[in-house]
């Protein structure tokens, strides 16, 4: 119904070039499908004790690269999911430009990753969860769509937001519980 189309448009405000509800629905389903792939990558990060952030890059309707956060494992700030996926995509395409590619990220990119996305000329970015503390895709800054740059990225926000947000929240809840337990044990040892 028309009201359903309107509701989806409200959820994904800022979306342009949607001409019909049918077109919108087809695109939404495709975005959801690829965001699920990014979520699978995020779960790999969680399995190695890293913050669960995942990314996939799609070209011509096919996933050409995947990445997940390995910052803690690799002990480098450069091991963000987006950068790892971009490196693979560039190698696969044989070019540093990722034109005609869509990147699906479970968490809004930081300033480093947003800058790399713009520099690589990624056409479109689909974000799961926004990042109020470090997001540069619209939360704190919007580097992706800045008119001052020579390239702007089309951005869709909130695709599978609940699932992406809950995965991160659960990870940090668990981390806080572990830290509390360690603190409790240290205190107990000091008292003995």
Residue ranges of each PLM-predicted region?
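A short, polar/charged loop-to-alpha-helix boundary motif
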Residues: 73-83
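Zinc-dependent deaminase
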Residues: 19-48, 112-192
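Short beta-strand scaffold segments in enzyme catalytic cores
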Residues: 53-61
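Short, small-residue-biased leader/transition segments that mark boundaries at the very start
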Residues: 1-6
């Amino acid at each position: 119904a028309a009201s359903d189309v309107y509701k989806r448009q409200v959820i994904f405000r800022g979306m342009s070039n949607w001409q019909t509800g049918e077109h919108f629905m087809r695109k939404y389903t495709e975005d959801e499908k690829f965001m699920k792939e990014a979520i699978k990558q995020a779960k790999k990060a969680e399995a190695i004790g890293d913050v669960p952030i995942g990314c996939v890059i799609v070209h011509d309707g096919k996933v050409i690269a995947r990445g997940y956060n390995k910052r803690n494992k690799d002990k480098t700030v450069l091991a963000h999911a987006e950068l790892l996926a971009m490196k693979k995509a560039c190698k696969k395409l044989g070019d540093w430009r990722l034109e005609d590619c869509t990147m699906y990220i479970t968490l809004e990119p930081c300033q480093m990753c947003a800058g790399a996305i713009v520099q690589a000329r990624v056409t479109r970015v689909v974000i799961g969860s926004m990042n109020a503390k470090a997001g540069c895709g619209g939360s704190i800054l919007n580097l992706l769509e800045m008119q001052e740059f020579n390239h702007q990225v089309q951005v869709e926000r909130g695709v599978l937001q609940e699932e992406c947000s809950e995965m991160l929240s659960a990870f940090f809840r668990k981390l806080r519980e572990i830290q509390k337990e360690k603190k409790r044990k240290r205190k107990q040892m000091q008292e003995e």
